[in-house]
Amino acid sequence: MSAWVLPDHIADVLPSEARHIEELRRGLLDTARSYGYELVMPPLLEHLESLLTGTGEALDLQTFKLVDQLSGRSLGLRADTTQQVARIDAHLLNRQGVARLCYCGPVLHTRPDRPHATREPLQFGAEIYGHPGIEADIEAVLLSLECLRSAHVQEVSVDLADVRIVRSLLAGLPVGMHQLAQVHGALAAKDASELASLTRDFPSASREGLLALLQLYGDAAVLNEAENLLKPFPGAREALSDLRAIAARMDGVRVTFDLADLRGYAYYSGARFAIYAQGASDALVRGGRYDEVGAVFGRNRPAAGFSLDVKQLVGVVSAPSLRAAIRAPWGDGGALSAAIATLRRQGETVVCVLPGHGSEVDEFHCDRELVLVDGNWVVKAI
């Protein structure tokens, strides 16, 4: 195999795309900061138990594992940053009130999580800890929408669901893990006959409620129908009320609901959302409430947030035009170097042409040049 061939679903990022990614990264972090979120930078490598305790099988399978040559302990390359930020909130910051944290860094996956995806996403996310109320959920959704607006993403739509609905329908039932997984699978596939078979011994209210979920997807009218069908279940009613409150704050955005959507069931503890956009084959943003995320670190704080892959975002957002540069001759100092330094401090890109390379073309289009006129270095159009 050639030495330059990279592993499957791993790629170099070349200059034009790298510039676009970096501009998006800066814009996302600036947007999060404008909401009061503080930047943290967890390590790419951690002890395996810190990365995986309480996260479920899916993240375990996505995590690259190795042995620490210093300690002999098992290490993991993070496949998701949320667990690390929860550790930071629980043990390093240890604040009593609200903590707003954001991050942006690479994660590694053993397998791509969607067709044609990279196994090295650049994950951006924002999380708010310490507030159990619906306000934190709303802020997470609004911030994620503002992040997409800052990136000039067009025609977004938000899909809402809440794991508490299914949990309330199953509460108190003697359902084993295997049967629970089968019920979840039938709900995800919207397979009414399979779900009816699996729930034939359930109490009628729970059985009818679960079967009704298969039809409860669409616009806000779904919530009205669900409230009528799920009256015997207080947890479901609370979840529906929260979904209505979240949707009410999203002016000018198309909002849909799928009350049988169980993605992240083992992870989320309340409302969850996914944001789609024109040109994207999958959700650009996923987030929600995950109050149990810090429990494994001994500090079970309320938490809500979201994450996205900046590399995926690049695929649906046009790169802004690169500002034309100024071409300048190579010099050893004096007035020429001073003129170049002044232009760069003013925000201009000045490309010095090295000896023997005057006719070469690079990524930076130069529409001006620095020339010597009457003993002074001045900028002229090419």
From Swiss-Prot:
GO biological process terms on file:
histidyl-tRNA aminoacylation; L-histidine biosynthetic process
Molecular function in Gene Ontology? histidine-tRNA ligase activity
Q: What else is known?
A: This function is generally fulfilled by the C-terminal part of HisG, which is missing in some bacteria such as this one.
Listed GO CC annotations: cytoplasm
What does the record give as the function of this protein?
A: Required for the first step of histidine biosynthesis. May allow the feedback regulation of ATP phosphoribosyltransferase activity by histidine.
Task: Provide the gene name from the record.
Answer: hisZ
The protein's predominant localisation is cytoplasm
Q: Quick one: which pathway?
A: Amino-acid biosynthesis; L-histidine biosynthesis; L-histidine from 5-phospho-alpha-D-ribose 1-diphosphate: step 1/9
Q: How does it assemble?
A: Heteromultimer composed of HisG and HisZ subunits.
* Annotated family: Belongs to the class-II aminoacyl-tRNA synthetase family. HisZ subfamily.
Which Pfam family, giving just one, matches this sequence?
tRNA-synt_His
Q: What is the protein name given in its UniProt record?
A: ATP phosphoribosyltransferase regulatory subunit
Question: What UniProt keywords are attached to this protein's entry?
Answer: Amino-acid biosynthesis, Cytoplasm, Histidine biosynthesis
Identify the InterPro entries for this entry. aa-tRNA-synth_II/BPL/LPL, HisRS-like_core, HisRS/HisZ, HisZ
Q: Where in the cell is it found?
A: Cytoplasm
